[in-house]
A protein has these predicted regions:
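N-terminal mature-domain "stem" immediately C-terminal to a signal peptide or N-terminal signal-anchor/transmembrane
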Residues: 1-67
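Extracytoplasmic/periplasmic, Sec-exported soluble proteins
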Residues: 10-14, 24-31, 46, 50, ...
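Short solvent-exposed coil/turn linkers within tandem alpha-helical repeat scaffolds
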Residues: 45-49, 133-139, 181-192, 232-243
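Acidic/His-rich structured neighborhood in mature extracellular/periplasmic domains
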Residues: 56-179, 185
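A cross-kingdom marker for long, charged
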Residues: 203, 215-292
Length: 292
């Protein structure tokens, strides 16, 4: 009776060979759309550890080549056509790009794992982590959580032109997600990037931005934001975010909610207690993380 011949699963050594082949292709600066497709083809059948390595190679490629991808979109005729589109940009708008060469350039950019964004009258590419999440079922739990964290920002950036462009609720959600990643996967190779994202979000939340200050009239913290802080401190008291929010609330209680004032020269300065909190926020947050 004839028997069916089964194809053996890929061995660790064959997986490693594929990873090295992919790494060589990335180092040779293959076009992003070709490289992303190669990654998906080569990842088929790979185990989580090997799949993670493919993602890391792809991310390193993006870090190296993002500026070059941006330069390809900087030609005046390209910018003019892209700025005519509705923003935020969606792929169904491709047909609205009149110039065929510009349309093909944008199609290749999107196929390479980028998405388009705009600020200060310029269009530029950003890495679309949501496209890397397409392979989320193949990678490890830690890598999938990392890609999900990074996709929050690539799906909807948190800040633009020194101003917060998401809600305080969404910012808190992202801050807690970044903290949770570091606490859950402290030894992950992606830990440092997640930690830096946590610090960035935490500073936005507790110190504001140039064009989104946390204070209003009389240099006092915005009442609605203080209420938000109080809710965060209670609901997330076991987190670093919640504990540092409580520390800020304690300071506000001693300053009458003031975070700044005018000195004798009429210059705006932070009150001493709040200034000390701002200056030490990053070091305190990092020190509270595991392995710091």
């Amino acid at each position: 009776m004839p028997t069916e011949t089964l194809t053996p699963p890929p061995s660790p050594s064959s997986d490693q060979t594929l990873i090295e082949q992919f790494r060589a292709k990335a180092l040779a600066d293959a076009p992003a759309h070709e490289l992303l497709q190669s990654m998906r083809d080569m990842m088929a059948g790979a185990g989580p550890a090997q799949a993670d390595e493919f993602i890391r190679v792809m991310e390193s490629y993006y870090e190296k080549n993002l500026n070059e991808a941006a330069e390809r979109l900087q030609a005046e005729n390209v910018q003019q056509q892209l700025l005519k589109l509705s923003w935020p940009f969606t792929e169904d708008q491709l047909t609205g790009i009149e110039d065929k060469s510009v349309r093909m350039l944008v199609e290749q950019t999107l196929a390479g794992g980028y998405k388009l964004d705009t600020a200060e009258g310029m269009v530029f590419p950003v890495v679309d982590y949501g496209k890397l999440l397409i392979n989320g079922e193949q990678v490890s739990t830690a890598m999938k959580a990392y890609l999900s964290l990074m996709a929050m920002e690539s799906d909807a950036r948190s800040a633009s032109d020194a101003a917060l462009v998401i809600t305080w609720d969404e910012l808190t959600k992202r801050t807690l997600a970044a903290e949770s990643y570091v606490m859950t996967f402290p030894d992950s190779p992606e830990r440092q990037k997640a930690e830096d994202r946590f610090i960035q979000y935490l500073q936005y939340y507790l110190t504001g931005m140039d064009n989104t200050p946390i204070f209003g009239t009389g240099y006092k913290v915005l009442p609605d934001l203080k209420t938000h802080y109080e809710q965060t401190a209670v609901a997330h008291s076991g987190t670093i975010t919640g504990q540092l929010t409580r520390e800020l609330l304690d300071i506000l209680n001693t300053t009458g909610d003031a975070v700044a004032a005018k000195n004798k020269n009429g210059d705006e300065v932070y009150v001493a207690e709040y200034a000390a909190f701002r200056d030490s926020l990053e070091s305190k947050a990092r020190a509270a993380l595991p392995g710091s």
